[in-house]
Regions:
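Glycine-rich FAD pyrophosphate-binding loop
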Residues: 22-43
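Conserved N-terminal helical subregion
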Residues: 55-59, 67-162, 170-178
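Residues at the starts of beta-strands that form the adenosine-phosphate
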Residues: 4, 27, 215-216
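N-terminal Rossmann-fold NAD(P) dinucleotide-binding loop
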Residues: 14-15
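Beta1/beta-strand and adjacent pyrophosphate-binding region of the FAD-binding site
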Residues: 1-11
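FAD/FMN-dependent oxidoreductases across multiple families
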Residues: 227-312, 319
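C-terminal helical "tail/cap" subdomain of flavin- and related membrane-associated enzymes
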Residues: 306-387
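Conserved FAD-binding catalytic core of PHBH/FMO-like flavoproteins
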Residues: 149-249, 258
């Protein structure tokens, strides 16, 4: 087989790239290790898409049900600090949109199924070549020749392992607890909440209203691993949910199973090796504090496609090293900045030091009074500042 772009991983990022390239007359083939089996259950996993991510998906004909957010309120549960972000302050109708992961994944998979090899995987790359084509050996024994091999296969990327590129990894020593909650006394379903305290980082995001189910929220609650040594996540939620209900002045009913996963980040020092490119979680991951992981991945995919399409339209080789390097340069700095920023906020808002608590309360209140600073943060988080 011979194809201009081989995409390892049929997730959201890989499928998006395939659709974008197809619209611009560049053929691609997705190699996906799982079977073609759409998950028709709603699930509890959600994604928070910023305005830029939504516009990228809509340009490819992806328009799924979402819960818009036009206000985000963040407060310090150990003091009086708070900050309010409003879409009106940056002349936008919304700050972000929450979608169901399965809805988006199923829609993309359906659109790309004819360009996907399911139940297969790239086992090795026999020849890395940025001048001609690279040769990949698949799990079924077939070989594949491609000008570019795009690793979009997630944070445990097999393609990343094959490249041998250096990688930095950090364990936060935290666990994220996530579940769906019904907010009983809620008068505005367009508001997201975030609270920081010694009981963890608590985020409450509205969910799409399906089958007349209203006032449903997805909760992501990050706590220190040490807390769960003698108590289960379910018991911890049962014993401590009232603390955040009191802080946010709401009542929450747990409406789903309670899941949990360990938190860590990683970042590759380089995103390319000859004609092999790492994109999205294959190249980097961050703390879910701000829900920016998927947005960074789609921003990667956007710039990757932009550079490849520009080269193709100019009659240049799409795997020219200078072109692929432009993608790396444009995205690596932004991703690293977001990763380091999240690490700072996690440490800052997890601290139990009294002086740090006083400082962050002062900081939140000061930024809340400074419109241009708030506007800068909001425009950046919304993906409106493109580099």
């Amino acid at each position: 087989m011979n194809v201009p772009v081989a995409i390892s991983g049929g997730g959201i990022i890989g499928n998006y790239i395939s659709l974008r390239l197809k619209r611009n007359n560049i053929d691609s083939l997705i190699i996906e290790k799982s079977d073609y089996m759409p998950d028709m259950s709603e699930g509890i996993r959600t994604l928070t898409l910023n305005n830029h991510s939504m516009s990228l998906l809509k340009a490819e004909g992806i328009d799924i049900e979402s819960a818009p957010i036009n206000e985000i309120n963040a407060l310090d549960g150990e003091g009086t600090g708070k900050i309010q972000f409003l879409a009106d302050d940056i002349n936008e109708s919304h700050l972000s949109h929450v979608v169901m992961f399965n809805d988006l994944k199923n829609r993309l998979t359906e659109l790309c199924k004819d360009k996907t090899l399911f139940n297969n995987e790239i086992n090795s790359i026999q020849k890395f070549n940025s001048e001609d084509t690279s040769e990949a050996i698949l799990k079924d024994g077939d070989s594949l020749h491609a000008q570019i091999i795009a690793g979009c296969d997630g944070r445990n990327s097999n393609i990343a392992k094959i490249t041998g590129l250096p990688n930095e990894h950090y364990e936060y020593k935290q666990t994220a607890i996530t579940f769906i909650g019904h907010v009983i006394n809620n008068n505005n379903s367009l508001i997201a909440h975030q609270a920081f305290s010694e009981k963890g980082i608590f985020a409450l995001m509205p969910m799409p209203n399906k089958d007349s189910k209203k006032n449903r929220y997805t909760i992501v609650w990050s706590i220190d691993n040490s807390i769960l040594q003698n108590i289960s996540p379910t018991e911890y939620v049962k014993n401590n949910l009232s603390f955040f209900e009191s802080k946010l002045n709401i009542k929450i009913e747990v409406n789903s199973e309670i899941l949990n996963f360990k938190l860590s980040n990683h970042h590759f020092k380089n995103y390319i090796k000859d004609s092999v490119v790492l994109i999205g979680d294959a190249a980097h991951s961050i703390h879910p504090l701000a829900g920016q992981g998927i947005n960074l991945g789609l921003a990667d995919a956007d710039i990757f496609c932009e550079e490849i399409i520009n080269a193709y339209n100019k009659g240049l080789k799409i795997n020219n090293k200078a072109i692929l390097k432009k993608y790396e340069i444009r995205r690596k700095g932004m991703n690293l900045l977001m990763l380091k920023s999240m690490d700072f906020f996690v440490d800052f808002f997890s601290s139990k030091n009294l002086y740090i608590i006083l400082l962050r309360n002062f900081g939140l209140n000061s930024v809340n009074k400074t419109k241009f600073l708030k506007a800068f943060f909001m425009r950046h988080a919304s993906g409106l500042n493109k580099f």
